[in-house]
């Protein structure tokens, strides 16, 4: 896996400008803040992020992938201000579950998610080396 950083560009904080990798591609559907049985245990933004990341890691494991194989993450949030306000807690959960691994990443505010209680949805692509 190669993290792409054009010469002279400021290094982004918490993500990479791009990633190049080859191997077995694993696509993880958008994971939200409910557990494996479809039950929400919190309406707290950071709490839902923690659960969504836990769900991502669980799905990756089914393919023999680990967090360090993630090459791209897309975060859909319903409230940008809640996302920004929870940066610290999100960072703690991210480092605990994903580690110090910062793939290409996009965060987008959306009007709503299909599940009404969901505040965040995280979609992931990973590439497991062959």
Regions found by a protein language model. Give the residues of each.
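N-terminal presequence-like segments and the immediate start of the first folded domain
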Residues: 1-71, 77-130
């Amino acid at each position: 896996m190669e993290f792409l950083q054009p010469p002279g560009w400021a290094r982004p904080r918490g993500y990479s400008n791009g990633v190049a990798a080859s191997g077995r591609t694993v696509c993880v559907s958008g994971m939200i803040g409910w557990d494996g049985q479809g039950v929400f245990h919190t309406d707290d933004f950071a709490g839902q992020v923690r659960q969504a990341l836990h769900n991502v890691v669980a799905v990756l494991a089914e393919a023999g992938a680990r967090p360090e194989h993630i090459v791209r993450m897309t975060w859909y949030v319903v409230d940008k201000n809640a996302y920004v306000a929870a940066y610290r807690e999100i960072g703690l959960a991210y480092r605990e579950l994903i580690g110090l691994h910062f793939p290409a990443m996009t965060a987008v505010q959306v009007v709503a998610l299909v599940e009404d209680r969901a505040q965040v949805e995280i979609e992931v692509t990973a590439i497991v080396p062959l």
